[in-house]
């Protein structure tokens, strides 16, 4: 591999001379302690995992690559996703699109879950006109709910949605009421809300949602009749406001207040309209959306197959950044995977030709205001960037004044950081001097004061 490219507006540098097992990146996963796992197995546009790739899993930790070669993966081919257990930092699961689910503890493979030793199922060869002895356990993804139960999604299986409780019991959810077995070709990654509602995309039947409402299982879907541009949903992401962002092979939609999917029958997804430069148009119309990430400021990062990576404002109505191979270190405009690392603020972008990291300036919310930081500080002449304040909580009021108390900027946080363009309410850049930054939580119980020197 060629190492990891770290990009910020002023420099691009290779972080380590070692690298992933190969530059062909299929999916990136962020693990605890700023670690990364990268898969190289794959499926094609139609979720076909053949030819079955015998590739290992790349792992980046503490500045070095500590990769798991295929030889230790118990024969699991076409590994497409790695997911950490949020209640056990030393445990991850690797999803294989043919051989089941690998359990890895402290970097050692300890189990290969399949149809012989778990509640997972192989596809039905008779249903699919295959050799009766054919077995294929096609696990696209797993995700964990608030109780620590692990959910998984499997292709070409009637009861394709599985739940493994912390006690090791398996439960199966029948999807055939929405999706015939022979058309359950593939699914997106899973997203689980704070209320334990499960959302995922399907190749042929749109967005799928599952929840238990007052103890009753509810299975719902959205398709083109509900304003999706196509039934082929490739990526889903929940933001801080319980809005579900839906990426398809033909564009982007949003389901506001997503939990309504389970209680209302007349829902439709919303099209986002972008107005820039006097032009009005649909956001990402006809674009193949491959991956969506929500950063610590509730901004939306969207990867595409052919148009690079976009960063949109919280509401999706303005473009903050658009990275392409022409204006950034991206080696190609076909970007398969995004991963946001909340501690560092980095966004990782995985492509068929390599991995790029962008040093973003959105951080996850802090638990208190004890470590508020301001940078750059001081701000020197000719600096044209933003001032960043991070270490904040959500819904803090941030007020910036000059040394005698005249307010020049005020905002309310949506995540762990805010940015100021150094302009006052008049729109002009502020004068040289010391400025005070007052931060107060929305309940008024915590506060912090910082200073910044601005030199023009």
Question: What are the roles of these predicted feature ranges?
Answer:
Residues 447-452:
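Edge beta-strands of extracellular beta-sandwich domains
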Residues 1-371, 407:
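Carboxylate-rich, polar loop motifs that coordinate divalent cations or form catalytic acidic clusters
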Residues 397-408, 427, 435:
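Short, glycine-anchored, charge-dense loop/turn motifs used at functional sites
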Residues 141, 291, 309, 397-398, ...:
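Generic short beta-strand
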Residues 145, 193, 391-393, 413, ...:
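Surface-exposed coil/turn segments at beta-strand junctions on protein surfaces, enriched
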Residues 367-399, 417-420:
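Glycine-centered coil/turn sites that cap beta-strands in beta-rich domains
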Residues 413-444:
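Short, surface-exposed loop/turn motifs with a glycine/proline- and acidic-biased composition
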Residues 454-456:
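Interdomain boundary/hinge segments at the C-termini of tandem beta-sandwich modules
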